[in-house]
A protein has these predicted regions:
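Active-site and donor-binding regions of nucleotide-sugar-utilizing enzymes
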Residues: 2-37, 42-164
Length: 164
């Protein structure tokens, strides 16, 4: 996993209207955001860490969200799962400091986005479907999305049944 570390407090823009989660297809999302809204891209490839005192304090407070024996990601060992949760908690802390009005992604099946959507109910998380889902047979109990813009009626009918 590639990472990038920043420590300058000036690099955090507070009170951004929209965070685009992941740079994949971010240009498409930027094209539909009205000019009256500010936005920034939260890059996940490589993961960017911005370290400031407010983020560290929020991170410590949010450590209560770590679930030691709950499996949030599939096919990962115990320690990878804990590190993955820690990463999600860091991103949650970052988002809480920035205070966006919404978080949008085109990676609708991203497990980090799903975790954040489930654990941050006070901010709308919006996913735009990026692919055709042929089967719901897999265990998707880890998936959660507050708002999904999708391709057709199949998802509209099945999404609520799966309690996502």
């Amino acid at each position: 996993m590639k990472t990038s570390l920043k420590s300058a407090p000036s690099q955090i823009k507070k009170s951004i209207d929209i965070i685009i989660f992941d740079e994949t297809n971010s240009q498409l999302i930027m094209n539909i955001i009205p000019d009256t809204y500010s936005y920034s891209i939260y890059k996940t490839r490589p993961v960017e860490f911005t370290i400031t005192l407010p983020i560290i304090l929020r991170l410590i407070f949010n450590l209560k969200d770590i679930k030691i024996f709950e499996q949030f990601t599939t096919n990962k060992g115990f320690f990878k799962n804990i590190l993955w949760q820690f990463l999600c908690i860091y991103i949650k802390s970052y988002i809480q400091i920035v205070k966006p009005k919404a978080v949008i992604t085109s990676i609708d099946n991203c497990t980090k986005f799903a975790w954040l959507s489930k654990h941050m109910q006070d901010i709308p998380f919006i996913a735009i479907q990026n692919g055709f889902r042929l089967s719901y047979a897999l265990d998707n109990s880890l998936y959660h999305c507050q708002h999904l813009f999708c391709f057709g009626d199949f998802e509209v009918e099945n999404f609520p049944k799966r309690e996502w």
